[in-house]
Amino acid sequence: DTGYDGAGATVAIIDTGIDGAHAGLDDLDDDDATYDPKVIGFYDPVNNPSLTNGTEVFPYDDQGHGSHCAGTTAGTGAPTYEHIGMAPQANLVGVKVLDAGGSGSFATVMAGMQWTVDNRYQFNIRAASMSLGGPGAIEWTSSEEASVNRYGNAMVLAGHPLFILAAIY
C-alpha cells in the first residue's frame, strides 16, 4: 500500500463505456446523501458523435468491458468492498469507442484519443487506459499506424501516462 488513492486525479477509460449507475462507480464516497459522481465526463463517438462536451450523455456501457477496466482502475468496491480499484478516490471519464459487441473502428478509437487530449484540462485527465484487442493481428495501413503513433505521442506529451493493452484472442 503506497498510500496513494487517486484523489484529485481523473483517469480516462477508452473502451466500451462506463456504467455510471454501477454501485462501485457511481460516486466517490458511496454515500447516497452526497452528490459527488465518480464519472465526471463521457464521450460516445460510436452512438452520439455530435455530443462532444462530455456531459450530454449519461455514462453507460452496453458491453461491460469498459466498466470492468474502470472498476480495476478506480472502483470504490461497493457494495461488498471485496474488490477495490487501484485508485478508488480518482474520478473517471468514459470514452466509448467500442460498440455493444466489443467491436470498433479505427475512426472511433482515434476520435476518442483526440477527445481525451482536447479535454484533458476540462476534466483534469492525468492518465488514460485503453485495453483493446481482437481475434487476430491488427493490420494497419501506414497512415493509420502513423495516426496511432501521433495521437499516442500527443497524449503522452500532454502529460497522460497512457496504458495500452492490445490483446489477440
Model-predicted segments: where are they?
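Substrate-binding/access-modulating region of protease and related hydrolase catalytic domains
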Residues: 5-7, 76-80, 94-169
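Subtilisin-like serine protease catalytic core
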Residues: 1-43, 47-107, 121-127
